[in-house]
Each structure stands twice: as structure tokens, then as C-alpha cells.
Amino acid sequence: MGNIVLQLLAILALCIAPARSGWLQGTATFYGGADGSGTMGGACGYGNLYDQGYGINNAALSTPLFNNGASCGQCYLIICNYDKAPSGCRMGTAITVTGTNFCPPNYDLPYGGWCNTTRPHFDMSQPAWENIGIYSAGIVPILYQQVKCWRSGGVRFTITGLNYFELVLVTNMAGSGSIASMSVKGSSTGWIQMSRNWGANWQCLAGLAGQALSFTVTSTGGQTIVFDSVVPAGWSFGQTFSTYQQFDY
């Protein structure tokens, strides 16, 4: 117990990201290759994680953590539980990762494998995982907590779809990192409630082409921001629009 207490004190002294929850127990593996290139894309819909502001410190989340995509973009501070696996852990180190993908159960394995439907498990990019674990260990017990996300620049909106179907991908979100609810307003409409389609993609079934668009986004931390006329009237499907606004929580 003494080792883990000392480790936690050292980590807490180093961490500048304020915790959003207490320490919880879980496990972690890695995927995506030594350069992490295999982690690009994923079930949150972010695509190239470098372009979208997330980088290589990312993880695929097991079912209870992924929460059907509601946790996409959330940040987690992770340390290896040295007391449980001294031969597999790097003592005194920590890493903050963003949830960018889903780690599904493998029903060819007993109980669905490491990413089963009840286990809190992070399948991290290999470069991120090797900050806390020894490569030969493969899987390690961890302690984790959700923390505030820090991003460079403002929130971004990418619009895809066709005709009366708009699909909006929200990226580079700081604070809690994830969306609780979202609405859109055209220059000729009132506010229209959107719904999650998949991952960080939110949908609207309305004919908004040719209109300037505004968004209201409420984070899972409870902060609401209105992005007024962030999309000009001449927009086209496939475009990304950057803002100067950002979430604190």
C-alpha cells in the first residue's frame, strides 16, 4: 500500500488538470502500433486525431466507459497500479488520454474478454500506454479518473450529410470534452433540437442548406455555449468551421 500512496502523491503534485471524479480501478492494454497510427479513425468519428486536436494520447473505451458514444472526447488521467503489478508498471508516471474509440467485447473469449460489458478498460495507443506500463506486460491494472480536457484553439464543427439531413461532428472540445445536448438554428428557422447519431456526430432532419447556422451546445459538465452564426450562408457539405469559443467545464 505504501508504494501506491507515494505514487499517488507524486502524481497529484505533478498534475495540473483538476479532477472531475475520484480514483477508480480498471485495466489497460494497448493497440495501434508503436507509432499509434492504427488508432486513427474510430467509433467517435474523429478521423485523423492529429487534425482534430487529440493527438496520439488516446484510448478506445470499453462498454461502460464508452456509454454509447456519450463519452467521446472525455479526458482521463491514468496511472499504473504499481502495488498490484510492480513488474509491469512504471512507477511515478501518469498519462492523460482522450476517449476516441470503442473497444467492443470479444465474445470468442470468456466473459467477452478485457473489453467486456461490465469492465472499465482502456485500450490505449501504444505510445500513451508505454508511459505507464512495461511493453512485455501487455495488460496492467490501473487507477483512473476523469479530468478537465485542455485544447488548443476553439471548438470546431464539420458538416456532412445530404439535402434534408445534416450530420455535425463536434471536435476539439475542452472542459468535460463531451456533449450532453445540442441544437441548431438556421437564419430562417428557430432552434431545432439535435440528436446523437453516432460517436460525436449529431444529426438534424431539416432543410438548412443556404442558411447561416448557429449552434447551442451543452457539455456533460453542464456548461452551455451559443455559437452564433458560426457557419456562413454559403456553406457546403464537408466543410469544417472553427470558432474562438471554448468550454471550461
Curated annotation (Swiss-Prot):
Keywords: Cell wall, Cell wall biogenesis/degradation, Glycoprotein, Membrane, Secreted, Signal. Expressed in roots. The keyword Signal applies. This is Expansin-A18. Glycans are attached at N116. PANTHER family: EXPANSIN-A15 (PTHR31867). May cause loosening and extension of plant cell walls by disrupting non-covalent bonding between cellulose microfibrils and matrix glucans. No enzymatic activity has been found. May be required for rapid internodal elongation in deepwater rice during submergence. It is found in: Secreted, Cell wall; Membrane. The keyword Glycoprotein applies. Residues 41-154 form the Expansin-like EG45 domain. It comes from the Eukaryota. InterPro entries: Expan_Lol_pI, Expansin, Expansin/allergen_DPBB_dom, Expansin_CBD, Expansin_CBD_sf, RlpA-like_DPBB, RlpA-like_sf. It is a peripheral membrane protein. Residues 1-21 form the signal peptide. Belongs to the expansin family. Expansin A subfamily. One of its GO terms (biological process) is plant-type cell wall loosening. Pfam families: DPBB_1, Expansin_C. PROSITE patterns: EXPANSIN_CBD, EXPANSIN_EG45.
